[in-house]
Amino acid sequence: MNKSKIEWCDHTWNPITGCNHGCHYCYARTMTARFSGDVRLNKMCKADYSTQTGPDESTLYILDKPMLSETGHPLVYPFGFEPTFHRYRMDTIGKLKMGNNIFVGAMADVFGEWVPDQWIEEIFTVCLEHDEHNYLFLTKNPERYMKLANAGKLPQQNNFWYGTTVTRPDQEYAWFESGTYNWFLSIEPILEDFGKFGATVKTAPPWIIVGAQTGRSKNKVIPEFEWIKNLVLTADTFGKPIFMKDSLIPIVGEKNMRRDFPKQLLEKTISEKMQNKLYEACSECGKVLRKNQMVALMARSKRGTPAKQYPS
């Protein structure tokens, strides 16, 4: 569990890493190469992991505990960018006491065709157990959402957000009817103008995220100001929030940046354990207040009785 540098979430959680999409602009593939060690040697340590065949017949790796390097340090991506289920990471969610917006699978496509339903269901189970957080999922395979929904396996909780990543206006994305599932659209990197987008939909997505391609690729696409303006107009026409990533500052300027969130993602909740630690019922009025907003008055009816808590 890591604090995130991704502007639209608080933390990233990566119980699954690796992806088979093969996108040429993928930042995650480049990053894993720096923290994988010698993948060939890692695969020789067969006692440290297990494998299974994925739904698409690809080889998948499973780690029930971290694999260590020769120096005793955990290898974050011991199999490079090959799909890996880090089952030992499933309990890290419980270490967060305050409610957070958590991006699940920043270094993978959790809903790729190669990912077994069992892996996804295990992740959902953990998320459901810790409902003080908002969980944001992203995929380039939105059809998997539909398959899971039709099978009754896609949680409909209000704190689950299902996003689709697209880069061009002709790509498919998951569209859920209002009142069913929370969903959003991530247009990153934006590679073409979405200018006609607003004229072809009956309403905008509940949330739009947009960002430019980063890195030093000689073929990097630099979006035009009008491309971003058109998306903002679409969002504003339908009264929907839009979030611009910092990669757009050179394109639109800081004063034109929009960093809107859906209302729910701005609300923070806390775990039951932290609730009991920080809050207490006033002994006089019965209201539940933060302890640091209350004062203990030495008002005792007789010697030996505890002081009562009153609002400050």
Segments from the language model and where they lie:
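Auxiliary Fe-S-binding modules of radical SAM enzymes
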Residues: 1-11, 35-38, 56, 61, ...
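N-terminal [4Fe-4S]-dependent radical SAM core
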Residues: 1-101, 278
